[in-house]
Amino acid sequence: MKAIIVLLMVVTSNADRICTGITSSNSPHVVKTATQGEVNVTGVIPLTTTPTKSHFANLKGTKTRGKLCPNCLNCTDLDVALARPMCIGTIPSAKASILHEVRPVTSGCFPIMHDRTKIRQLPNLLRGYENIRLSTHNVINAERAPGGPYRLGTSGSCPNVTSRSGFFATMAWAVPRDNKTATNPLTVEVPYICTKGEDQITVWGFHSDNKIQMNKLYGDSNPQKFTSSANGVTTHYVSQIGGFPNQTEDGGLPQSGRIVVDYMVQKPGKTGTIVYQRGVLLPQKVWCASGRSKVIKGSLPLIGEADCLHEKYGGLNKSKPYYTGEHAKAIGNCPIWVKTPLKLANGTKYRPPAKLLKER
């Protein structure tokens, strides 16, 4: 009983020092809430990061494709897509691809009128497939195509392993052997020859030059008409005659002519058609492509690995669930973009020390 009386006396004698509520020092952490606006809390965990620009990398757990053909030295992706001699090789399969050539200005072999068609898009089209292979057989016999017989034209800028001159493996430059005369539009059917249910990408085009060269090669110096049709898409062209400055490609002879190159996508079992006059570049080997590969704009080389590939920041490792800064396309295990930093309150709402209770 005595012990109890002593305890009560201690409490009573120190009543002016008892505080109510939570005591803490002034908190520097402020969070915005949905119901109370800005609130001071005793602790927070940052949920956002602001990345810095870095090199691009291989995506963790995924095959990442940089160049279409890594082993094709001194070749642009357009060289590979058109199967330029010395630029033919294996394209590795990949679930993710880096678009590193935005506007290739040359493809070797022969001066191309890039802006007449969507040919600049061909490497990017191929890049969007997981599996890509070039057919081992030609899709048509170009020498015996309608309007022939033809000899196959070559360029000194296209040396191959057996000759100082050649041409793209995807096309045959059809030059009449004997019947160098004007012709009405001719039609050739392009069969589907891929064997695994892939999309078939068929490359074709036409050559045009000045009037003297057109007469010499084809016996007709007038503008020529061309049409391709496949998978419900039809494209028309009329060739331009003359007006081209001489241009040299990769050490070959100066060329007064130009070629226009296009492609058509054929679905499994579907036949395409090409209607043409003189100067046609008939399709030969075709691309067989399947699966999907995610494509993102970036740069080479790919160094190391990263959780995420971001068009503005390169390779990112996911240290926080959200990020601020520049918003752009990203692929992989990426943080989510937010306008302002996010914080998770892991403490309590800050309360100032309660006023001391005074004895009356």
Swiss-Prot record:
Coiled coil: none annotated. It is found in: Virion membrane; Host apical cell membrane. Glycans are attached at residues 40, 74, 160, 179, 246, 317, 346. InterPro entries: Capsid_hemagglutn, Hemagglutn_HA1_a/b_dom_sf, Hemagglutn_influenz_A/B. One of its GO terms (biological process) is fusion of virus membrane with host plasma membrane. Its main location: virion. Residues 1-15 form the signal peptide. Keywords: Disulfide bond, Fusion of virus membrane with host endosomal membrane, Fusion of virus membrane with host membrane, Glycoprotein, Hemagglutinin, Host cell membrane, Host membrane, Host-virus interaction, Lipoprotein, Membrane, Palmitate, Signal, Transmembrane, Viral attachment to host cell, Viral envelope protein, Viral penetration into host cytoplasm, Virion, Virus entry into host cell. In natural infection, inactive HA is matured into HA1 and HA2 outside the cell by one or more trypsin-like, arginine-specific endoprotease secreted by the bronchial epithelial cells. One identified protease that may be involved in this process is secreted in lungs by club cells. One of its GO terms (molecular function) is host cell surface receptor binding. SUPFAM superfamilies: Viral protein domain. It is a single-pass type I membrane protein. Binds to sialic acid-containing receptors on the cell surface, bringing about the attachment of the virus particle to the cell. Plays a major role in the determination of host range restriction and virulence. Class I viral fusion protein. Responsible for penetration of the virus into the cell cytoplasm by mediating the fusion of the membrane of the endocytosed virus particle with the endosomal membrane. Low pH in endosomes induce an irreversible conformational change in HA2, releasing the fusion hydrophobic peptide. Several trimers are required to form a competent fusion pore. Belongs to the influenza viruses hemagglutinin family. Homotrimer of disulfide-linked HA1-HA2. Major glycoprotein, comprises over 80% of the envelope proteins present in virus particle. The extent of infection into host organism is determined by HA. Influenza viruses bud from the apical surface of polarized epithelial cells (e.g. bronchial epithelial cells) into lumen of lungs and are therefore usually pneumotropic. The reason is that HA is cleaved by tryptase clara which is restricted to lungs. However, HAs of H5 and H7 pantropic avian viruses subtypes can be cleaved by furin and subtilisin-type enzymes, allowing the virus to grow in other organs than lungs. This is Hemagglutinin. It comes from Influenza B virus (strain B/Texas/1/1991). The gene is HA.
